[in-house]
Amino acid sequence: MEEYRGELLAPAGTMDCLKAAIAAGADAVYLGFSGFNARTSAGNFDADSLKEAVRFCHVRRVKVHVALNTTVYGTELAPLADAVRAVAASGADAVICQDLAVAKLIGEIAPELPRHGSTQMSVHTLQGALELKDLGFTRVVLARELSLPEVEAITRNCGIETECFVHGALCMCVSGQCYMSAFLGGRSGNRGSCAGPCRLPFEANPLPEGRPGRLHHLSLKDNSVIDKLDRLQAIGVASAKIEGRLRTPEYVAAAVNACLAGREGRAYDRDLLKNAFSRSGFTSGYLDGKIDGTMFGVRSEADAELTRKTLPALRELYRRERSRVPVKMKLEIEEGGEKLTVTDADGNRAFAYGDAEPQPARTDPTESLQRSLSKTGGTPFAVEKIDVEMDGGPWFVPGSAVNELRRTALEGLQQKRETLRPWPVQEVELPPLPQRTLPPHRTLRARFESWDQVPEQALSGLEALILPIAQADRVPRAWRSKTILELPRVMFGALEADTARRIAATQEAGFAGYEAGNIAHLRMCRGLPLSGGFGLNVTNQLSAQFYADHGLNAILILPEVKDSDIASIAPVQNGQPVPTGVIVYGHMPLMVTRACPLQNIHDCAHCDKTGLLTDRKAKKFPVRCGMGVRTIYNPVPIYMGDKPGALTVDYGVAYFTLETREEAAAILDSIRQHAPFEGEFTRGLYFKGTN
């Protein structure tokens, strides 16, 4: 039996890319369903073209994974349900999803359709992967930032398939936690419309006021770990994924070709792969655990020129149909005619009958007949075995007649393989969206980065304080009953175990509860008082209700959601409303990153864990390092303190990060008094929304 080498999964932004991937040798493709995938500017597929794609792939033993991996607004839930039905009708092999509303609808409409957790779910820990398993997911796409030992620890213990990116672009931010494109331009990366701001100038060097940044200190080189495919395979990774649904057929074919060679231990043309697309080379820093300034790079004009010169050679990689479906043939010849039977490994069978009058042969024609039947070039089929039976022979059959038998039988087999096999669907009626009214008393919560920021009179007029769990020991016992401990949105390396220890140490310490920022926290805090932070990316009623059903006692709505959509989010628990909230003040964390942009100018030994990034408009974005990650903040804070009735929620959160204790006290006073903000501020996306 042939050794299973794991799935090679290629991007298919268009039908041309899909065909290039298959011709180059991909085992599976992933593509986006129009309107609900994380690459809206790719070609994408509607209900009809998806069926065409599935037919084309399934004939060739290639699986199709459909991306429905965006956050969804309430008004989109009905079209989303239609999209789920369309995917089920196509017979595609799996759905990749981010929003738990998508997962919930698949479970209700097409419960047998496999669900894969998108990298947009920010799963980077064993606890997160185990939670997805409990929720019925069959595969998780792991975060790109993981090292090989971290991938291994998850893969060997999570009980579901893991999928890892092995080649292609690297986002600067942890996927699913990037809000930069949305807040700077209204194009949400969580909704597939990222404008790519990290490819623009953001300079870490200290610059005087007014001078624009010119260097690209947020731009990472493309990831390439093809040389480590054998190690990923050895630890049990089920799927090696190539990123690039916005790339060309030539790029797709080059990446597939290189990955096939890497998987089989063969040499591949590294220069050809680099010339297909690179940003001044590749990096394997994350998987190697070597995260430093060498990971950064930009696409130069020289890179683009090399790509243009290499296009003819790249096109040769997918010019011919690859014979990849093994078939067995049986040719029966008797005095009255011929019969050819063709079968594949999936149990499909096709027949062809000839009316050529066989003539007695002087010598045994078996080898000649087998040679004619084995000529399957230009088709998806490769002959594995040919049996020839002659009743009363030997018989001579003209080559043209044998060729016609072969063509007819293979066409019949192809038609059978093209037959769609839809997933069973159930009738599901979506409940009408709730329309909340403004509660009579909206409360205020305040989140602080450090206990040093907390004003002495902070509890006055506040429903709750929120502090990172690492600050728990600093909270006086008298304050703890109103203090919620925030869990880190990202827990790379030892931080997952450290967070678990801190949860265990604080359970009986008198705190009000915990705030989740990642799906892993549901499992880590099972049975404990738990609310939801913005890192859960709640944007609609179904996802909010999911979290309420799993025990969350309050939910902070993602600040990308528009006011009218906020009003339709009203989860309940045991018949009682679950409070929802919004950020009413704060420098929005636009990115959380594992690679450090400050390493472009100095190493960690010479860094005080703070910095500024200056963009091309001379705006300065604060950077703070801690807990194994770097957070990049919006230089302009959200402020809604003077608009107390604008957003239909139960509580507001003043989200303090960069402020001093005195500044925090003054801002809290302004919010309580509904006073205008003194200084530059933004209303965020509450009134204009995103794409």
Language-model features: locations:
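Surface-exposed amphipathic alpha-helical tracts and adjacent flexible/coil segments at the periphery
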Residues: 1-24, 28-39, 53-54, 60-88, ...
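Conserved non-cysteine loop/helix-boundary elements of the Radical SAM core domain that shape
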Residues: 40-44
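Glycine-rich, highly charged phosphate/nucleotide-binding loops
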Residues: 45-50
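A cross-family signal for key residues in well-ordered alpha-helices
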Residues: 104
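Active-site PLP-lysine loop of aminotransferase-like
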Residues: 124
